[in-house]
Amino acid sequence: MDEGTFKGKVVIAPEVLMTIARLAALSVPGVARMAAVPGGVNRLFQRRPYNEGVRIVVHEHTVRAELHVVVSPGSNMRDVAERVQHEVARAIEQMVGMDVEAVNVHIQDVEYSDAGGE
């Protein structure tokens, strides 16, 4: 059978896109961790899922991502956010082949140590 003659479709679960986006964001220097999505149902039940901090909306063949991050102290927040946008879009386009409409980055906090005076 020649390539391209198969019938059917490929469905990518939103959880896959969330994992790709989360890992891409965490790979950016200056991202300390993901933050809880405000108003998310997982927060109500005190669960911290592997896809925390990521919302994905898929419309046909286009992806829109919302990422909530906590940055490391001393990081340039604008640079970190722009790098997250670039890395998440690149990862989704490269790994899944879907178009990325937008990557919105919400910086929720700065990760400071609880040790006083350090």
Which sequence ranges carry the predicted segments?
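Contiguous, often N-terminal, cationic amphipathic patches that form binding interfaces
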Residues: M1-P73, M77, E82, M98-E118
